[in-house]
From Swiss-Prot:
GO terms for cellular component: mitochondrial membrane. It is a multi-pass membrane protein. Residues 118-185 are annotated as: Disordered. Coiled coil: none annotated. The keyword Nucleotidyltransferase does not apply. Converts protoheme IX and farnesyl diphosphate to heme O. It comes from Pyricularia oryzae (strain 70-15 / ATCC MYA-4617 / FGSC 8958) (Rice blast fungus). The gene is COX10. This is Protoheme IX farnesyltransferase, mitochondrial. NCBIfam families: cyoE_ctaB. Its EC number is 2.5.1.141.
């Protein structure tokens, strides 16, 4: 039952009201002498039947929107402010009561108006949405939901191995567009955890994850390309009178390099499982998730190291075997512990990346060695034939810096939390300068490969676009200090740069297309012409031929 109505004002208090407007708002003619009849008519037929929405204090725009939904002007609109203040905000419709109830803090007699509004308006049954959802834009809400899902996935990935063996582990969600995606070891660890316990496939996948397959593949390719580009007359064709490259040597080179790289990567994971657990890219690696024991990982690393060094020793030459062993020691014994001590670890890691090209070049040089085949002849030849190997080593050494500086920038906070000293957080300005400095060296390095006779001069032209692309991204990374997506742009430019340069060098090896042309069209070789003239005797035309006498 509605509460008591407020007493009606006298005619003298409402003498400023336009009765013609009041008559049009009520919908029928109302005598000017009967104000009560006008109020009762408006209460009997409300101006709006839409549900009442709760209002917030200070939300003037919401009040205007609610008033604009009514098809007719409210009758209270034509009363003076003095009249409303005198009678406590007397209202003509339920909507007006709701408005007066929310703004009653500024009007007298608020307690009585609140009682009337509560009696006339039914309680709302709808649940209001949280204020956070109303204020945040849609893409911010999606990012918050994605972060919540990632936190739940990381919490489940750190569970004990027994739980992983009983229930399949789903891979974590894809990384946001601004982050570096997880490495191959983390992806393989998720695949191994989804396999049945004690299965052969689970064990093999776990061991493959220990070897860091993507990094190992890059190391092997960086050794194969210099081996194939070594300047010899014949390409993968056995010969007796001329030096050549042997497919069997190439097989031992790739096998030994793969095993040495797998051993170094496994030892790296054995050394820092606690550090890997603190970083998003490495928190799902095998040792972090207890997919393999430390003892089994050590046995795997020792087996790969021993087998790889022996394959290089007996299948290639002792110089290449020494370089493979040095690569393991530098990466697992010096680079990995140095990451907690000094930012110079990046330069040590770059030296590790420059060793595989020297291994490939020394393997090819051993096939055509004419001396004792020592490391001086293979790597420091007096005639300068080893310059191509050192240029390839410099190319891989230089490439490490723009690639890693961009990669570490995206996870610099995680490096700091893990206690790994990287320039990305210890000295961001120097981090950008180093990336710029080494990003501008690729053009002269490619020209140097043409100058020493490893590739054709066309290689300097065809490699120019990709070199300029990397140089531009390095300049942008330096100018913005890694902001505005420059770090990610430099990272992907470096990812594409190295394979493109290697493929272009292989396609433009010095003299390769000339030999292909002669083999297809059968044009005579200059050496063949000289050899065919050895049995002929040439006479000097200036000399007179001997006189021939005949007897008559």
């Amino acid at each position: 039952m509605p509460g008591p109505r407020a007493s009606l004002p006298s005619l003298s208090a409402v003498d400023n009201v336009c009765w013609r407007c009041c008559s049009s708002s009520s919908g029928r003619p109302v005598p000017g002498q009967r104000l009560r009849g006008f109020a009762i008519a408006n209460q009997a037929r409300p101006l709006s039947t839409s549900p009442v929405r709760p209002l917030r204090f200070g939300a003037t725009t919401t009040v205007r929107a609610a008033a604009s939904q009514s098809p007719r002007p409210n009758g209270a609109y034509f009363l003076s402010n003095v009249l409303l203040e005198r009678f406590g905000g007397f209202q003509f419709s339920p909507r007006s009561r709701a408005i007066a109830g929310t703004s009653g803090s500024n009007i007298s007699n608020t307690k009585r108006n609140a009682t009337v509004a509560a009696a006339d308006i039914p309680p709302s049954t709808s649940t209001p949405r949280p204020q956070v959802d109303e204020e945040l834009p849609p893409h911010r809400r999606r990012q918050a939901a994605r972060r919540t899902a990632e936190q739940a996935a990381s919490a489940s990935s750190n569970a004990p191995s027994e739980a992983a063996q009983t229930t399949p582990v789903t891979p974590p969600p894809a990384a946001p567009s601004g982050e570096i995606p997880p490495d191959a070891s983390s992806i393989l660890s998720n695949a191994a955890a989804a396999q049945p316990a004690q299965s052969l496939r689970r064990r093999l996948t776990t061991l493959l994850a220990l070897s860091k397959p993507r990094l190992t593949m890059l190391v092997v390719l960086s050794a194969m390309v210099p081996y194939a580009l070594y300047p010899v007359p014949d390409f993968l064709t056995p010969g007796v009178s001329a030096p050549s490259l042997s497919p069997l040597t190439l097989l031992f080179l790739t096998t030994g390099t793969t095993l040495c790289s797998a051993a170094a990567n496994a030892l790296n994971m054995i050394y820092e499982p606690k550090t890997d657990a603190l970083m998003s890219r490495t928190r799902t690696r095998p040792l972090v998730r207890n997919l393999v024991t430390t003892r089994a990982a050590v046995c795997f690393a020792l087996f790969c190291a021993t087998t790889g060094i022996l394959a290089l020793q007996f299948g290639v030459n002792p110089t290449v075997a020494f370089l493979g062993a040095a690569n393991i020691v530098l990466y697992a014994g010096i680079y990995t512990p140095l990451k907690r001590v000094s930012a110079l670890n990046t330069w040590v890691g770059a030296v590790v990346g420059g060793i595989p090209p020297l291994m490939g070049w020394a393997a090819a040089a051993g096939e055509s060695a004419v001396g004792d085949g020592s490391w001086r002849e293979l790597l420091l030849a007096p005639d300068g034939s080893s310059a191509g190997g050192w240029l390839f080593a410099a190319l891989l050494f230089t490439w490490q810096f723009p690639h890693f500086m961009a990669l570490s920038w995206g996870v610099r906070d995680e490096y700091r939390a893990a206690g790994l000293r990287m320039l990305a957080w210890t000295n961001p300005a120097r981090n950008a300068r180093v990336a710029l400095r080494y990003g501008l060296v690729f053009v002269p390095l490619c020209v140097g490969l043409c100058a020493v006779g490893v590739t054709e001069w066309s290689f300097a032209v065809t490699s120019l676009p990709v070199n300029l692309w990397l140089a531009r991204e390095s300049i942008r990374f330096w100018q913005t200090q890694g902001a505005a997506g420059s770090a990610r742009g430099l990272f992907w430019a470096s990812v594409w740069h190295l394979p493109v340069v290697m493929v272009l060098a292989l396609l433009q090896k010095k003299g390769m297309w000339g030999r292909v042309w002669r083999s297809v069209f059968g044009e005579p070789d200059l050496d063949d012409d000289l050899a065919s003239d050895d049995g002929w005797e040439y006479l000097d035309e200036s000399e007179e031929p001997p006189a021939v006498t005949t007897r008559s």
